[in-house]
């Protein structure tokens, strides 16, 4: 098992973890229905870029 040579200070530990933060997902408002969904994904009602591409649940 690997063993560290020198102790990593709290400052260096924080710098090492600086890229681990989570970001909120980008959201897109559909211009036709006003529903919010992720960009490049199908909206919950089955619309993509203003066209109906799949049947929504319950149709």
Curated annotation (Swiss-Prot):
SUPFAM superfamilies: Zn-binding ribosomal proteins. GO terms for cellular component: large ribosomal subunit. One of its GO terms (biological process) is translation. It comes from the Bacteria. Keywords: Ribonucleoprotein, Ribosomal protein. One of its GO terms (molecular function) is structural constituent of ribosome. Residues 1-59 are annotated as: Disordered. Belongs to the bacterial ribosomal protein bL32 family. The keyword Ribosomal protein applies. Coiled coil: none annotated. The keyword Iron does not apply. NCBIfam families: rpmF_bact. Residues 49-59 have a biased composition (Basic residues). This is Large ribosomal subunit protein bL32.
């Amino acid at each position: 098992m690997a063993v560290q040579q020198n102790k990593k200070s709290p400052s260096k530990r924080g710098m090492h973890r600086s890229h681990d933060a989570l970001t909120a997902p980008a959201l897109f408002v559909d211009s036709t229905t006003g529903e919010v969904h992720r960009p490049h994904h199908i909206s919950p009602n089955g619309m993509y870029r203003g066209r109906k591409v799949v049947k929504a649940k319950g149709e």
